[in-house]
Amino acid sequence: MLATLIVAAMLALPQDPVARPDPAAGPVVRLEDVVVDAQRLEDAAEAFVDAVAAPVGSRGLARWNEGVCVGVANLEGETAQYIADRVSDVARELGLRGHEPPCHPSILIVATSDGAAFAEELIAMRPVLFRPGGAGMNQGPAALERFRTSDRAVRWWSVSQPTDVDTGQPAVRMSGQCSGTCTPPAGNGTSVYDFAPNTAVRSVSRLSSQYRQDLKRTFVIVDVDRIGDVTLQQLGDYIAMVALAQINPDADTGRFETILNLFDEPGAVQGLTGWDRAYLEGLYESEWYRVSQNSQVRAISTTISNEYRDARPAEPVDGAE
């Protein structure tokens, strides 16, 4: 079992295992079963994107812009290397660079025997890593509290940044950032504008924006006493899915065949499914400059539909629609 393998390699002591919840009942929709029906495919694609996407506030969906560096802590040897390689390989399949060590991890995966306790300690030690201070860069205090206290087998937290595509600079004020002299002249105070981002608006449009949403760092905490009998391949693919996109941890995905259902029904999927790959490909292939979340969701759904409309359907699983 993977849990035994990881606990043996970890630097922490194991605890009593926690039972997994019962799998959700009902038929499962496979992407391969709906590609022959254009309207059904488009509707299902939009429903899947709506369910799993977790953008910050009213901002668009974030993604990694150029590359990722994957770090794995509290695991040793082949287990850690496999997970790092798997996440990096999926990133490369999406057109990103998968940096090799030594590099500063932008995706940090930590295994522990007590996910909640470790999350609390990490947040208390470096709160600025989770809430850096710039507007619209994280899901906020309520979501962070859920991340801290969750009893999930795997929990994750992402920080994103609105970025000016012309300059590559943050489009929001960062904590401690100053673009002016930053030194109060005699008798006067430093202008408040010195602490605001300086961007030049090159166009005004209700449909498009010159700003994109970049993922900057993602923390993934694996509670090894809660992962049950999942395989290393399943765990690696699950982590890749939640680390390379902003995924809603409370998404209701029971009607879809997706790796996100792993801990509800471990035997149902062996790795990234058609839906998972289609979502990631749609996210990274769709145009970044759309203003509204709705238009971005539709763009990703359309990308999924266009990509898979001509695919040949596989044999349906028992009970699938």
Task: Give the predicted meaning of each segment.
Residues 320-321:
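Terminal low-complexity/disordered tails
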Residues 25-40:
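N-terminal secretion/transport leader regions
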Residues 13-25:
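Long, low-complexity intrinsically disordered segments that are proline/alanine-rich
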Residues 29-32, 60-75:
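Acidic/histidine-rich, surface-exposed loop or edge segments in extracytoplasmic proteins
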Residues 2-12:
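Sec-dependent N-terminal signal peptides
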Residues 40-64:
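Compositionally biased P/S/T/G-rich terminal and signal peptide-adjacent segments
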Residues 71-86, 91, 95-317:
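Long, folded non-catalytic interaction modules
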